[in-house]
Amino acid sequence: MRKKFYRQAQKGICIATLSATVLTSIPTVSYAEAYAKGRAVMEEMQKLSLPTENAVTFNLADAALRQEKTFVDAYGEDFTTTVIEINIAKNGTYIIKGSNEINGAFVDTHIKVEKGVEANIIFDGAQIQNNQRYASGVDSCGNIYTNQLFPVLDIEGTANLYVEKDSCLTSPDMDYSYVIQVTGDMTLKEGNGRLTLMRGNCKEDSEEEKYGESILGRKEGENRRRGTVTLEGGDLAAYGGIEGLEKFTMTGGKAELSYGDSRCVYAEDIAILGGELSLTDDAEKEWVSYFLKGRNS
C-alpha cells in the first residue's frame, strides 16, 4: 500500500525508447591505442580525466573492511551479522574494486557518503551482491514485513560516480528493495565501463530482475529532502524503477532503464537535455505507451 500510494503521488516517465541529441560523450578512441600495452590502470584513469589524485582504494576482499553489525528486528531481538562498511566522511576520491564474495558467501556491503561530503567514487570492476534481509517492522494491520539490511550505496551528501571497468551492484531479490538510496545529489560522470544496477544476481538473466527499485530518492519516516540524479556521461543500465527523486536530469552519456511496471522514472522534475536514453517495459506486455511528464519537464 505504501508503495502504491507513493507512486501515485509522483510524476513519471514511462516505458518508451527515447533518443536525445548527444551533447557530451566519452571519446571513442580506444585507450589501448592511446597507451602502450601494460600501462598501469591509474594512468588510464588519468587519461579519462578521472580524479585519481590522492585517491583512497577500497578492495572489498580486504578483511579490515568487515565488521559485526547488530540490527533490532520487529520482535525486539538482536540480529547480528558480518557486513562490509565503507563510511565516506571526508571530501576526496575513492576507488571501489573487487567482490564482496568471501569464501563462497556474499557479505552485504554498505557504502555511505555522509551529509555535507563531496566524494568522487570510481568503480573499478566492483561486483557487489547484497542478499540478506530481516523482519524489520510491523504494518498497521500487525503484519510483519521484511527489508534489506541497507542499500549498497547510501548518498546523503554529493557523489560523483565514475566507472573505470564494468561494475555491478545488486540488492536482495525481494519485492521492496533498492540498490542506491540518494537523499543528496548523485551524478554519473564519464567512464570506460558500464554501471549495472539490479535486484538479485548479476550472473542471472537481468530481464527477470527488473522489478523493484534501482534508485530510491527518499528515506521513509525521515523529514529530509529528496535526492537528485544527474547523468552527464558514462554508461548506466538500471533494472528496476528510479523513484522518489526531486529531480532527474540527463545531459549526456548512455542509459538503459528497464522496469516491469508502467514507468521507469518518478521525479518531481525531469529534464532530458542530451545523451542516449532507452526506456523499455516488460516484454510480456502487449502495449507500449510513450509518456514524459514532470512538473518542469
Q: Where would I find each of the regions flagged by the language model?
A:
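Hydrophobic core
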Residues: 17-25
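Intrinsic disorder/low-complexity detector
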Residues: 25-26, 32
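Bacterial Sec-dependent N-terminal signal peptides
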Residues: 1-15
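A composition-driven surface/loop motif
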Residues: 12-15, 31-297
